[in-house]
Amino acid sequence: MAAELPFYIASSVEELVKKHVEGVEVDKNYSIFHYLSTCNNLVKQADIYKSEGDIERTYIYSLRFCILIFEKLQKHPDFNKESFTKSRNEIKRKAELKLKELEGLKETLKKGYERIQHKKEEERKRIEREKEKERIFKQEKLKLEREQQLLREEEEQRKREDLELESEIQRLKEVEDFENRKLQAQKNIKRATSARTFELLRQEALLEERKRLQGIETEKKRILAEKQEALEKEFQQQLFEQQEKERLEKERLEKEEQLRLASLPPPPPDYSSFDSDQLLNLIENNNKKLENNNQTDDKLDNEFLLDPSFLPPPPPIITQPSPSQEKKDNNNNNNNKNTTAQLPLSITQPPHMPNNEKKLPPIYNSTSPIQFGYPSLNNSVNNPPSFSLQNNTPLIQQYKQQQQQQPIQSPTNNINRPNIPQYNNYNAKPLSSNLNPLPPQYQPQQQQQYQQQQQQQQYQQQQQYQQQQQQQQQQQQQQQHQLPKLPQYQPIENKSISANGLAQSPAVNTPSITPTTNKPNIDSSEASKKYSKLRKIIVHGEVFQEFMRLAENNTKRSIETCGILSGTLSNDVFRITTIIIPKQEGTTDTCNTIEEHEIFEYQLENDLLTLGWIHTHPTQDCFLSAVDVHTHCSYQYLLQEAIAVVISPMANPNFGIFRLTDPPGLETVQKCKLKSFHPHPPVNGIPIYTKVDHVDLIWGKKSDSKVVDLRFLKK
């Protein structure tokens, strides 16, 4: 037995019994198993505190134990139940031993309290003696202080008289100095008045001169402003006239350009799709036409033979000409100032496809008139090209290959390209030989608006994605602050266990999580502050994994599994060392133990205390249902540190540790007589249960914790 600890709970045996033993009652609604477990807990705690030398707590738990056994528990209707005969006899035997120990403990407590009272009395007398000595010392000190006060008063009186004499002499000197300063001040005032008058006159003269100069300057500014305003009006009039002339000139040029474009001949047919026979027939027909045509060159222009498959050539690719080409262009422009660009018509080079060796088409801009490279009718008609049947087909194929290799420049790829006619389909046929359909025109503003809309949609999607990521991070941080998460549960196949201690198997179809109603905020500060300081409980997390492995068969069938948390007490700290899985009957929402005497007998044989209970929620979240709070009330009523552990493989986090608030949760559930599922609203804003803060959950360290399965124990 350890050394006896000093008494600290009470000052007498009567006070100890009144505060910590009286008020123990038996509730018939709680099973006899809970009371027998409580008796076992009491006697175990009494033995532990006795070994630690805590006589007061040993007496408290021993007296509670004896009162329950010999007075209160015999009134329970199941006390004489046959299945608990062995356990009941063992408890009675321990109660008789504790009853004998109580007399010795009571005498030890009385002697200890008497020693404490004697020490208190001695301390009181010592304090009185100290007070008497202090009183005499204060009287002598006060007398000495009075004598010293009289001496100080006489000295101060003498000093005051000396000070009064010095003060009178000083006053006379000050009067004389005052008269002298008064005379000097009057002289200074007269001198200052004269100087101020002179300064005022000088300032008035300066002010008049300044006003005169300001008037002259103002007049100059006014005249200058009038001249400037007249010049601006004249300049604006000239500018307006010049702009009007430019506008009229621009309109005239635009009309001339429109008339010139309207008079242009239609573009030549596309010879690239013709074979050699078609080209020969076309040339023969054209020659016959020309022989029969005796009109002028202008009429020949209008009556030029059009192929039914005619379409205007594709838009020229805008390229930057080389310096040599620019020089060549300038020479051609000087020779042909009033004509359009001319291209030779030959079988090897279509008119709308310039050769690399030929002159490049001019770069169009928005200010210069638009010109199309049509072939000259005079040259093409008067001097028809000669065709060779032997070389027709290879040349056409070569031309088609060049046309396929030639890159087609899209209008959208060059934002600086002028707004010129564009043709989308080069194989489409015109409605008639004399009517060309208007081609669609490229509109850069629509393209820019479309790109802006796409950018805005992408930006909004990015903002929504970032907000969702921030919300998920905040939820994860809140969950990490609440409780550590058990490794994700998975059902096992053929009892194969993974490296992290939980079972691994193919997925099993499980019902969806049942949505729960609005549960109270069990994490609120009010809920955690409403119960007194509790003794700490230490538990290793690996024992929960082992429990889930053994409960896997029920979990796959969506049936709840329960167990009893058992452990030891040392240095005022509980340690959960064993989870007992008893014989039980379970459904998807409830779990009831049977053959409870086996649990109690195992605890007696292994010196274990009941510290709470554990059960699973295969299809629900981690919380205490109405049935669960009534079940836990029987544990916490008999041991205020008792906890309830809920494991839900489908929740996140997948387990929780709870207890009833005290007050008001424990008292509320005790008074509730309803059965089955029913709501328990918060009381004055405080929920009836909360998460615990007196449990230390340890992971990764080696421990001797275990799970004992009594479900398959033979009778």
Curated annotation (Swiss-Prot):
- Recite the UniProt keywords alphabetically: Coiled coil, Hydrolase, Metal-binding, Metalloprotease, Protease, Ubl conjugation pathway, Zinc
Biological process terms from the Gene Ontology for this record are: late endosome to vacuole transport via multivesicular body sorting pathway; protein K63-linked deubiquitination; proteolysis
Ranges annotated as biased composition (Basic and acidic residues) = 287-302
Q: Where is this site: Indirect zinc-binding?
A: E560
Q: Where is this chain compositionally biased, Polar residues type?
A: 339-349, 410-427, 502-525
Q: Which domain of life, per UniProt? A: Eukaryota
Listed under GO cellular component are: endosome; membrane
User: Residue numbers of motif JAMM motif?
Assistant: 615-628
Q: Which Gene3D superfamilies match?
A: Cytidine Deaminase, domain 2 (3.40.140.10), Phosphotransferase system, lactose/cellobiose-type IIA subunit (1.20.58.80)
- Which terms in the Gene Ontology molecular function aspect does this entry carry? K63-linked deubiquitinase activity; metal ion binding; metal-dependent deubiquitinase activity
| Keyword Hydrolase belongs to the record | yes
Task: Give the cofactor note text.
Answer: Binds 2 Zn(2+) ions per subunit.
Please state what class of enzyme this protein is. Answer: hydrolase
Compositional bias per record (Low complexity), positions renumbered to this chain: 398-409
Span of domain MPN:
537-666
User: What are the boundaries of the region Disordered?
Assistant: 287-367, 398-450, 502-527
Q: Where does Zn(2+) 2 bind?
A: H630, C672, H678, H680
User: Which residue spans adopt a coiled-coil conformation according to this UniProt entry?
Assistant: 86-302
Q: What is its EC number?
A: 3.4.19.-
Purpose: May be a zinc metalloprotease that specifically cleaves ubiquitin chains.
Q: What is known of its domains?
A: The JAMM motif is essential for the protease activity.
Q: What is this protein called?
A: Probable ubiquitin thioesterase DG1039
**Species, as recorded:** Dictyostelium discoideum
Source taxonomy? Eukaryota, Amoebozoa, Evosea, Eumycetozoa, Dictyostelia
GN (gene name): DG1039
